[in-house]
Amino acid sequence: MRTLWIVAVCLIGVEGNLFQFARMINGKLGAFSVWNYISYGCYCGWGGQGTPKDATDRCCFVHDCCYGGVKGCNPKLAIYSYSFQRGNIVCGRNNGCLRTICECDRVAANCFHQNKNTYNKEYKFLSSSKCRQRSEQC
């Protein structure tokens, strides 16, 4: 029974919002593009601190701030509806916090696309020692 519970929790994480966000990024930038943003700069990936290194990193900072303002559900697990229409991400008929989460993810995916020319490979797997400046306010 415990094994079944662990599998269920893992599947929720895979089917949840972070997976949807990854699909949005890949849809805007191409297959497997999400891997470029998993550990980039000071804000792309788990946590975040310091000053964003470039426009790409700022996309992640804004996304973190957006998630920080979500009330009523967990932005990393909640499942919302969305679609791609003529290359544009369109959030579906979501209510309340699901709508907010979808918009956070849509804006970030579009931001990555709009700022893809600022992506700097030197910021991939950036040491946290490079992000020790005082964090900006959302």
UniProtKB/Swiss-Prot annotation:
Give the domain of life.
Eukaryota
State one molecular function term (GO).
calcium-dependent phospholipase A2 activity
Keyword entries, A-Z: Calcium, Disulfide bond, Hydrolase, Lipid degradation, Lipid metabolism, Metal-binding, Neurotoxin, Presynaptic neurotoxin, Secreted, Signal, Toxin
Q: How is the cofactor bound?
A: Binds 1 Ca(2+) ion.
Describe, from its UniProt entry, the tissues in which this protein is expressed.
Expressed by the venom gland.
Protein's job:
Heterodimer RV-4/RV-7: acts as a presynaptic neurotoxin. Monomer: snake venom phospholipase A2 (PLA2) that acts as a presynaptic neurotoxin. PLA2 catalyzes the calcium-dependent hydrolysis of the 2-acyl groups in 3-sn-phosphoglycerides.
Instruction: Please identify the protein, giving its name as recorded.
Output: Basic phospholipase A2 RV-4
Species the sequence originates in: Daboia siamensis (Eastern Russel's viper)
